[in-house]
Regions:
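Short secondary-structure boundary segments
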Residues: 84, 107-109
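Hydrophobic, well-ordered beta-alpha structural blocks that scaffold small-molecule cofactor pockets
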Residues: 1-99, 115-140, 150
Length: 150
């Protein structure tokens, strides 16, 4: 059963991904050690800041985001990860789609408009924190923080 699920989710083959945004979040994602033991491989990092383009980040050279459609012909990424401010996220999504990428993980706090053949998933840190905040209203968690757990 596990083998069949792995096959259905396409985790039995390498899944190539690019990250757009070489700031704090993008840098952390490129260096995430969990990718080493997964099917996912980060094959490119892109940014629009000319002072970052050409620099090395881990073992990847930061490329100009505007060149993503051209460079993905060689990289062959099928997943794009957006780690840019909200104001730039839709443009980045458009670049990813122009590059032939049909699966997008979006960390920007904005809803993306994508064609029907593209799947976009949003990671909303604030919403997740709100959910955690709701769960704090449990008897053991009421009180003054860590001291109430004792």
């Amino acid at each position: 059963l596990l083998d069949r699920l792995t096959e259905i989710m396409q985790l039995d083959r390498e899944q190539r991904a690019v990250i757009v945004g070489a700031g704090n979040l993008g840098s952390a994602l490129v260096g995430y050690s969990g990718f080493a033991s997964s099917a996912f491989r980060i094959v490119g990092i892109f940014d629009s800041n000319f002072s970052k383009i050409g620099r090395m980040l881990w073992d990847l050279e930061i490329q100009d985001a505007e060149r993503l459609p051209e460079l993905n012909r060689e990289l062959q990424a099928s997943i794009g990860i957006i780690a840019v401010p909200a104001a730039a996220a839709q443009h980045v999504a458009d670049l990813l789609i122009a590059a032939g990428i049909c699966a997008i993980l979006n960390f920007a706090p904005i809803h993306l408009t994508v064609p029907d053949h593209v799947t976009a998933r949003n990671v909303d840190f604030l919403r997740e924190l709100e959910i955690l905040s709701y769960h704090l209203d449990r008897p053991r968690c009421l009180g003054d923080g860590a001291a109430s757990a004792q």
